[in-house]
Amino acid sequence: MMKAEAAGSLPKTNAEAVRKKPGRKRYGWMKGLLLPAVIIAIWQVIGGLGVVSATVLPTPVTIVLTFKELILSGELFGHLQISIYRAALGFLLGAGLGLMIGILAGFSKRTELYLDPSLQMLRTVPHLAVTPLFILWFGFDEVSKILLIALGAFFPVYINTFNGIRGVDAKLFEVARVLEFKWHQQISKVILPAALPNILLGIRLSLGIAWLGLVVAELMGSSSGVGYMIMDARQFSQTNKVFAGIIIFAVVGKLTDSFVRLLERKLLKWRNSYEG
């Protein structure tokens, strides 16, 4: 009798779990807003009480008003448009090359032996170390900025693509041989789908580093862009404008990351992975 009751209660529990799951997914993103909301509230209270000087730490309300001024003057969209153009072009160039060379090195041991040692050495060189060289070689023109961004965007995609291909289970190749897949079918139906999670992770990391590269490029030498706006505001002690620029970088970076995560969910529906 006890077993029958237990067995009868299991479907109900599972049904409740299924009913609750969509709700958790639908409203789960709101939990991520809790910490920023608390920080902003404390920040506003500290600034409002005058604990910290407004020159050092402007209140969130002041920063919002600064955003309003930048939008109405057209300054914000002008700088943001240029920054997005640079970041997008540098990312596409660097990530595209990283994907191509990662695939070549992943499939070919000989290519790996020729290229990987040099690429691993270059990967450890900081952006700030090569920035003076890029300026010396290419000047303060757009080319130096885009190449600097591309350099940072290259390595995450290259490493994750290479590791994704080399991490494919050898048993999948045996299955492909049993099914008499041709070489191009093994690549398109076995290797690349199995390596796709790593490749998408590389793209996410690459986007983040592309934005870091953009900041370095625009802070070191530029007459336009959000980075330039921050540097110009710093010279005139306009801390509220500096914070506005930082928030722009944070928001745009978060939006691009969310887009790639959405792409991951669409392309990796087949993967039954642990979600916590």
Swiss-Prot record:
Keywords: Cell membrane, Membrane, Transmembrane, Transmembrane helix, Transport. It holds the Pfam family BPD_transp_1. One of its GO terms (biological process) is transmembrane transport. The chain crosses the membrane at residues 32-52, 54-74, 87-107, 119-141, 146-168, 199-219, 242-262. Residues 80-260 form the ABC transmembrane type-1 domain. PROSITE patterns: ABC_TM1. PANTHER family: ALIPHATIC SULFONATES TRANSPORT PERMEASE PROTEIN SSUC-RELATED, ALKANE SULFONATE ABC TRANSPORTER-RELATED, MEMBRANE SUBUNIT. Belongs to the binding-protein-dependent transport system permease family. CysTW subfamily. This is Putative aliphatic sulfonates transport permease protein SsuC. It comes from Bacillus subtilis (strain 168).
